[in-house]
């Protein structure tokens, strides 16, 4: 009985870790001995500061040399941050996602203001358009409840 329980736990662990790996937003060598996992909200000023000042140094000195893998994990603290994460994940290409992530952090003071979520979404979508996303695709992504659940479940 103990062996059966162990096998079931092992199967679930492998399944869920494989599922989580497929959804992570990461750059760098997947075989690196070091992985930096950052949980952040796209409306967090300290997170934007980290991304604009520290992340690029880490990228240049460690990620680009294959020494470190960097993973961005969403931890949206509000609807604006959730919607920005959804827009980032509209891209298929991981490098495009990271490029857009950088732009969203860079322009955080411009889009992450106000109380009207529709205006905030339009501001985020303008940044997405600069990153080769189409309005229709972003609208579809924002309506996709599976994307919302995927992002929110990473916080747990």
Model-based region annotation:
Residues 76-156:
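Cysteine-centric redox/oxidoreductase cores and disulfide-bonded domains
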Residues 1-78, 82, 125, 147-156:
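Extracytoplasmic thiol/disulfide redox context detector
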């Amino acid at each position: 009985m103990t062996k059966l329980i162990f096998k079931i736990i092992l199967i679930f662990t492998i399944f869920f870790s494989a599922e989580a790996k497929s959804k992570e937003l990461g750059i760098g060598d997947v075989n690196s001995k070091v992985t930096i996992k950052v949980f952040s909200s796209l409306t967090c000023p300290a997170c934007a500061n980290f991304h604009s000042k520290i992340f690029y140094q880490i990228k240049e000195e460690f990620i680009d040399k294959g020494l470190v893998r960097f993973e961005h994990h969403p931890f949206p603290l509000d609807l604006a941050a959730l919607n920005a994460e959804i827009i980032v994940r509209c891209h298929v290409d991981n490098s495009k996602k990271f490029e857009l992530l950088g732009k969203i952090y860079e322009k955080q003071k411009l889009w992450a203001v106000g109380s009207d979520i529709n205006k905030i979404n339009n501001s985020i979508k303008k940044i997405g358009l600069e990153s080769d996303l189409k309005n229709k695709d972003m609208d579809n992504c924002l309506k996709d409840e599976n994307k919302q659940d995927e992002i929110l479940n990473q916080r747990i």
